[in-house]
Amino acid sequence: MVNVDTKLLVIFVELLSKRNATYVAEKMHMTAPAVSHSLGRLREIFDDPLFIRVPHGLTPTPKALELGPKVREMLDLWAAINEGDIATFDPLEAAGTFNISFAGTLGDALFDRFLLRVKRLAPGLQVRLTESSSWEADVAAMRSNELDLAFSPFPTRHPEIVEEVVTSFNMWVCARKDHPVLKDHCSLDQYLECEHIFIAQGNPGTRAAPSLIPLDYALQQRGLKRHSTMTVHAWRTQAEVAAQTDMIFTVNSLMKDLVCETYNLNAFPLPSELETVLGLNMLWHRSRNTHPMLVWARNLFKQVVAEYTGKASIAPMHPPMLTDDSGKSGKTGKGDAEKEDESRLSV
C-alpha cells in the first residue's frame, strides 16, 4: 500500500483543472521546480505519465482523466471529515463572513430576502451581497474561499464548480399603464413595434452562454430583431425610464411584481411565440460541497425561493451537477436540486 501525501493529490487535481504547471505553482505558492518534483512523484505512484507537455501547457493522459473524479471524491470526503457534520451545525453559534454574488440581470429582490433570513437565523454571521463583475472573478473568488455562493442564469460546466438549478421562471413585458401600444395584451407584432430598454449583460461569453440570449435567438430564427433604444445597468433604471416614456422592457417573473408595484407599470406575458423559461443556477466550489454552513445556506435559499415563488416545496428531481475533467456532466450523490434547466436569461 502506497502512502500518498494529501498535498500531492491536491496538486494533481489542480494540474487537471489548470493544465499549466506555472499557474498551479502560483496558486499554491510553490516554485515551478517543486510542482515538477510533485508531478514526478505522482507519476511514480500511479505508474503513468499523467500529463504530457504541449506548446501551451499540459494535456492529461487517459489515466489522469480516469483518476480525476476518484481523487476529487477522495478529497471531498476528507474535507467533509475535517469540516464536521451538518447535523451538528448551529446557525445561532455561527461566526465569520458569508459572501454571495449574483448576476445583476436576475434582479436583487430574492437575494435581499434571503440575506434577511440568514441574518435572522445566524446573527453572528457577517453577510456580504455583491453583483457579479465576471464569471472568471467569481470562480477565482470561490477557489480562494472568498466567495461562498454565486447565482447566475447561465450554467457553467466548469470542472471546479457544482451547480444546481433551484427553480425556473418565465419572462414578462413591462410598460407604463397608459402605453399607446400595449393596452391589454402584448402580441409579437406589438412587441417588435416598441422600443426596448436592455440591461447590460457584461461578458456573457465568459459564462458559457450563447452569443445570443434565448429570446433574441428565437427572434433571429424568424428573421426578426428587437429595436434596442437604450442599454442600462440595472432593472430600476429600466423601470424608471419605462414609467416616463413609451419604451418597454422584459423582466423575469421573480422581479415582475416588485417592478410593477414600485413604478406603477403594467406587465404582460411574453408573446407565446417567444415564451422563454429561465433557470436560476446556484453555484459553489466543489471543495466546499459538504461544508456544514454552506449546506445549511443552500437549503435555506431553496426554502426562501419556495416561499417567494408560492411553491409549497421544491422537490429534488436531479442532484446538483458536477462537470468532470473530460467535459462531461456527472452528478453528486446527495442531490438537492430541482429539475435541471439549461435556459439562459432573456431580457
Swiss-Prot record:
Residues 1-61 form the HTH lysR-type domain. It holds the Pfam family HTH_1. Changing L92A: In strain: AW1 and ACH0158. One of its GO terms (molecular function) is transcription cis-regulatory region binding. Residues 21-40 bind DNA. Keywords: DNA-binding, Transcription, Transcription regulation, Virulence. The keyword Transcription applies. Residues 316-347 are annotated as: Disordered. Signal peptide: none annotated. Changing N264S: In strain: ACH0158. Residues 325-347 have a biased composition (Basic and acidic residues). One of its GO terms (cellular component) is protein-DNA complex. This is HTH-type transcriptional regulator PhcA. The lineage of its organism: Bacteria, Pseudomonadati, Pseudomonadota, Betaproteobacteria, Burkholderiales. The gene is phcA.
